[in-house]
């Protein structure tokens, strides 16, 4: 499995608090069947994004893993004016594995009406947004049609493995399961921060997804799409949005198409 969102690198944000904890998180991932991890520290006003320090911490951790886990870097990108402007000349500074996909996190308290345009700007600058853990965001849960519009303009969706297991509350779980059933999700990731409450594990969530919607979809969400993002390739699994979701007012609904696997 491939995890595209975790906070495994120590001393950079609210994730691992030491190199020893980071190594134990990596060992937890290996035991869980994870082969590739993208370390994605926060990039916000509280935690400045420091690419050189991030690479140094990645290399230090990688040297302890005996080739059992491949580590890459990216970031958990907060949509501030400063971040968007800094991304403009060099989007790969922030993208996953310095390719094309960008994890984008929304504020839980306010999502301005201009967000459609901001996401479009990111795309014009060369980044493909992946909306992180929207099932945990009360504003998106209350008005998911906004997210569907972003999907229609080329954004993708990542939910947290622990949400599917009910560990972020019933509302997040119900939303994640609904989107899973409707083909709204493109990735499941750990968003791991530590060894206990936010572990670097995916296996249990994968088994639940396989039980609910089948092994092929589980493989797409935990392996095929994440590996494509890791490599900077087009995603092989992109279901068509259900009719009417995210349509502009007055638009003619699109016919529902079946999704496919390559």
Describe the residue ranges of each PLM region:
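An N-terminally biased module of ancient metal coordination in phosphate/nucleic-acid-related enzymes
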Residues: 1-68
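Active-site neighborhood of phospho(di)ester-bond hydrolases with catalytic His/Asp-centered motifs
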Residues: 2-4, 37-40, 72-76, 130-132, ...
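Non-catalytic positions within long, well-ordered alpha-helices that form the structural scaffold/packing
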Residues: 30, 123, 180-181
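Active-site environment of divalent metal-dependent phosphoester hydrolases
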Residues: 44-47, 78-80, 136-140, 164-167, ...
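Short acidic, glycine/proline-enriched helix-loop-strand junctions
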Residues: 48-56, 65-70, 197-223
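Extended substrate/RNA-proximal surfaces in nucleic-acid metabolism proteins
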Residues: 50-158, 236, 241-262
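C-terminal helical cap
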Residues: 167-169, 215-243
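Short acidic/histidine-rich active-site segments
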Residues: 184-200
